[in-house]
């Protein structure tokens, strides 16, 4: 994918899932051709679930470069992974358990600790991953975000007061 921003408007949920799977497939192919790996960050909620289910089926099941794909999350609920509200748990059920991806290339956010501790641990994991690729900054090949009916994305809700924290990458 290029650095150019393209806005695609799709009003049908089924077509949205199909387009998302297609875009992810294309981004993965381009990233692997360019640098031999694909780093994607996904959100939770209902938006990506249909896309995840499509990616776990043909033609994506056998055509995606799963062995070179690395999955990260943009947000997580502070619940066990087997809880119905877990973003990782939903992705595990709909996608990860169905595809041939090495377990050490799936990076769920720590959910069973204080949020600040989990954020620090995840930041360190991201830093190590991207430094090992030779990048000083975390630059994902693709970030997939959903938008809730109230306008929230990645657990950032309208009107939510966010405590600013300086993070050193």
Summary of predicted features, one role per range:
Residues 2-4, 64-144:
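Ligand-binding beta-strand-loop-alpha-helix segment within the catalytic cores
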Residues 39-43, 72-75:
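Short glycine-rich or small-residue beta-strand-to-loop segments that form or flank ligand, phosphate
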Residues 53-64, 89, 93, 158-167:
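A glycine- and small-aliphatic-rich helix-loop capping segment at beta-alpha/alpha-beta transitions
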Residues 1-40, 116:
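N-terminal glycine-/serine-/threonine-rich phosphate-binding loop
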Residues 24-27, 50-60, 92-93, 123-130:
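Short, well-ordered amphipathic alpha-helices
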Residues 42-47, 145-149:
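Glycine-rich beta-strand-to-loop/alpha-helix junction loops that act as flexible
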Residues 145-169:
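Class I SAM-dependent methyltransferase SAM-binding "motif I" and its flanking Rossmann-like core
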Residues 51-53, 83, 118, 154-156:
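Short glycine-/acidic-enriched loop or helix-start segments at secondary-structure transitions
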């Amino acid at each position: 994918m290029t650095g150019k921003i393209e806005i695609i408007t799709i009003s049908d949920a089924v077509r949205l899932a199909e387009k998302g799977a297609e875009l992810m497939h294309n981004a993965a192919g381009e990233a692997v051709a360019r640098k031999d790996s694909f780093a994607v960050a996904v959100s939770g909620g209902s938006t990506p679930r249909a896309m995840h289910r499509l990616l776990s089926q043909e033609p994506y099941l056998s055509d995606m470069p799963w062995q070179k794909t690395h999955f990260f999350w943009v947000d997580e609920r502070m619940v066990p992974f087997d809880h119905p509200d877990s973003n990782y748990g939903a992705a595990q059920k709909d996608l990860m358990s169905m595809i041939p991806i090495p377990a050490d290339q799936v990076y769920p956010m720590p959910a069973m600790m204080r949020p600040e501790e989990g954020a620090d641990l995840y930041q360190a994991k991201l830093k190590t991953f991207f430094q090992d690729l030779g990048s000083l900054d975390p630059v994902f090949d693709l970030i997939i975000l959903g938008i809730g009916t109230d306008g929230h994305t990645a657990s950032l809700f309208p009107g939510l007061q966010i405590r600013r924290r300086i993070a050193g990458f």
